[in-house]
Structures are given as structure tokens and as C-alpha cells.
């Protein structure tokens, strides 16, 4: 085991604080509408230019291992805030730096770190209550768009596109952001349920121009296993032919004589049919087939349930208004499923989302909810160069997360004023001793940091701006860095999602409290390895002159 380097008390805290300052100083220049960009070097390709706090934080790795500990702890604040709220990472970093700085000074002056931390936690809880009480629910299209515009640094098109996407797919719908080939923003909305499986044979195509198989008002057979034996599906095929309606078959796979017979019948015009593979793999495939069955009011034909293919009747099949199948995707529009059953299914999946600890599983479950409850929208971001596209995509991602957060927990006035005015709720809060009271005062002072930084990035004196706002009696008035005026921020559309502001403060207070209470730091000692010996000559080379 390698030898360890151990630093104690003041020496450890000073080094950790240096790391915190280096990371925070790089991140906080991006805060606010007039925040600057940061250029990130890449081992391959062009450098990346970003104004996204968490992207900057993730790139920073320091040479001194103790300074790096501080930087990595602060990076954790940005990452955690990003995971929970999707935005507010720079605000969280600025708050954490302010709390750590003041806390370290107090510890150096001889105060009890544990009582300081208790005071910080008390104050953070009180401020969160204040934010929740001031929060206003988001109701209309304009408010949703405004949250997106603010988070995307005043880019109106971004805000409008996100609001449009949300309006079309609903609050539960999935909205994804992709890079586009052109210069502009594009919005593609997929109605109904879409899954990534295309037709099994091009002979199923009904529209050769678009290379699409389209079925109007089809029956849908949902089968869990492989289909290779023709005899098992003959009875249901005959029933469908008599009904005169098209048929879509979804199964694990369809091969051999079963597929050949379907293709021949389609070409002869005896049966309008198309076949696709079932989406997903393993247990997830079965769950998705059950979703399709509920959406189309059909039954999943599974031998586990004792249903054999030979015994399937028409009333066991699902149906939909329209099905469209391309080479890659199948879209089921307007399934005949009962709304209350679909709602129950969505609730069941939601409870699975709450229970899961895996990010991947959570993402897949959320996709299933969206496909059942709303739809899928894709925002395609364009630009003149690859660097510009990536920078715009970062901003759209942030704006999308902020908008979702606003829909969940509502909005508060932006520009850092929600936190600044929350200092007034701490006036009546008293700690049990002087050290706890100092912890409360540290948070009170730190709550001014976001307003100060936004003003500073806009070229103003942060302390003067914060002082002027605190001395004023109107908690609706804030400093609008975009217009450089003091005005009613909520009325002019400068708003922040409550969830983003709340999460930023909670994560900052949590990690800052841990750093303040650190008394020793342990790192690996660099090993002095002896230089390797010169390799010996190769055999059989004797007698040669060099």
C-alpha cells in the first residue's frame, strides 16, 4: 500500500479552500445574462466554448491533491444540483464558495465547526420554507416560455420552442434535444406511441414514395414469442380477412414460412398486413408489449397466461386509428385503450420510477410514461459551426430542465432576488449558542452572493447593487442585468424555477457544511521510483560494430 500524506487543521483547510476558489472563480464568470463564456480544451478536435456551469466544473482537475479535494467537493455541488434540477449549477457553486469562505474564517477564529454547521442547516431550512411560500405556480404558455428564455440567457426562440413542445406533448411528454444539420431550430413532434422497430420486410410498404407502411384502423396482434409456424396463426388470419380490416403483428420475431405467407398474402391483395419486431429486450420487452396492449385495448398473447395463438379471437386483438411504419420506427396513433386503464398504468410506472435507484432504469421508465401519457418532441438545434451548435445545445438543455422544474414547483422572482430577500426571514431566527448564530449569519451573508455576482458580471459593483436592494422596502424590485435597471423582475419576465433555487441552496449548504467541519485531509504521497535499467542487447548480435 502506498504511503499517505496527511495534512491537519489550518493547513488542510487552507489548501481545500484554494481548490474551492479556483473552481468557483472559473464557474461564476458564467452567471447571469451578461456572464462570459469559458473555453474548454479538448484532447481531440476544436475547443469547446460553453456558458454552462456544470460543464466547466466537470473539466477542472488540479495538480495539488489537497486543492483538488476542495475542487472536487465543489464539483459535487454543481453535479448534484444538475441531476436534481437540471439548472442552477452556477448559483449553487457561488453559494457554496461564499458559505465555505466565511465558515473557514470562523473556524480559524476558534469557533466550533459542528455548531457552525448546525446554524447553516437551520438557516437553509428556513430559507427553503420561505421560497416555497413565495412560489407561484406556472399556468400559461407565456410563463413557460419566459422561464426558458431566462435560462437560455435571453434567447427568445429557445423559450418559445420549449413552450411549444410542452404544449404539444404535455407535462409528462418526453422532450429531447439533438444537433441539427442546418442553421435553424426545428421542432418535431411524434403523436401517439413510437418505438424503434421498423417493418420486417419492404414488401409490407403501402406508400412507395415515402417508403412507409400505413394501416388505417388496423387490428393489432401482440405476441410475446417468435412466430415461425404458419398453422398457429391461420385461424386469426382468416377472421381478420373476413372483417376486411388491416392487421399489424408485433412479435419477438417473425421468420420462415409465417413471414413468407404474410408477404405473399399482402402482395396478392388478400390481406392488408404488416409485421414488426417487439421493442426492447428481456423483461423490458414484456413490459413494453403490455403497455402497447393497454394503449390499444388488446391482450398480450403469452403462453405464461395460458393463451395459445391457435385460440386467439378478434376481441383479443388491439386496435388503433392509424399505424405508420418506416424502416426504423413504428408509430401507433390514437389507440383504442380505455383512458382510466392507461392512467392506472402510468401511475404504476411512476411508482417504479420513485423506487428505482438506477438512472438508466429511471430514464427508460420515464420514456414509457411519455409514450403512454403524452408523446415525444425533438428539438433540433442548428448553427454555423460545430462549436456553436454544441454551445447552443448546452443552453437549450439548461432551459429545458429549468422549464420542467418550473412546471413542477412553480416560479419565484429571478436575478438572485428570491435568495436576497429571503435574508429577511432569518432575522427572527436564533441559534442555541453564539457559534450556531454565526452559522445563521454566514448563510445570511452568502444569500447576497448570486445578486452580487450577476451585477459584477454585468460591469457593476455587486456590493452596491445588493445594498441598494436590501435597503429598499419592495421585495418585488430587483436588478435586471440585461436592461441594467432596477425594476419589478417578475413583471418583466425575469423569473427562476423555485426547484432550481431551492436545490442550489440545499446542495451548497450540505457540501459547504462538510468542508467546514473537515479537520484532516489524507492523500497519496508521490513515489520516487528509480529510473528503469537499460535493456540488455538482443541475442545473436555479437561481432557487430556500433
From Swiss-Prot:
Enzyme class of the recorded protein, top EC level: isomerase
Q: Where is this region: Disordered?
A: 526-546
One Pfam annotation reads Cpn60_TCP1
Q: Which InterPro entries match?
A: Chaperonin_Cpn60_CS, Cpn60/GroEL, Cpn60/GroEL/TCP-1, GroEL-like_apical_dom_sf, GROEL-like_equatorial_sf, TCP-1-like_intermed_sf
- As recorded in UniProt, its EC number(s) are 5.6.1.7
Positions of ATP binding: 30-33, 51, 87-91, 415, 496
Q: Which UniProt keywords apply?
A: ATP-binding, Chaperone, Cytoplasm, Isomerase, Nucleotide-binding
Q: Can you list the GO cellular component terms from the UniProt entry?
A: cytoplasm
What PROSITE patterns has UniProt attached to this entry? CHAPERONINS_CPN60
Query: Catalytic activity annotated for this protein?
Result: ATP + H2O + a folded polypeptide = ADP + phosphate + an unfolded polypeptide
Q: What is the top-level taxon of the source organism?
A: Bacteria
GO BP annotations of the record are: protein refolding
GO terms (molecular function) for this protein are: ATP binding; ATP-dependent protein folding chaperone; isomerase activity; unfolded protein binding
Give the subcellular location: Cytoplasm
Bias (Gly residues) ranges: 536-546
Sum up the protein's function in the record's words: Together with its co-chaperonin GroES, plays an essential role in assisting protein folding. The GroEL-GroES system forms a nano-cage that allows encapsulation of the non-native substrate proteins and provides a physical environment optimized to promote and accelerate protein folding.
The subunit field of the Swiss-Prot or TrEMBL record says: Forms a cylinder of 14 subunits composed of two heptameric rings stacked back-to-back. Interacts with the co-chaperonin GroES.
Q: Which family does it belong to?
A: Belongs to the chaperonin (HSP60) family.
Instruction: Identify this protein by name.
Output: Chaperonin GroEL
Organism per entry: Zymomonas mobilis subsp. mobilis (strain ATCC 31821 / ZM4 / CP4)
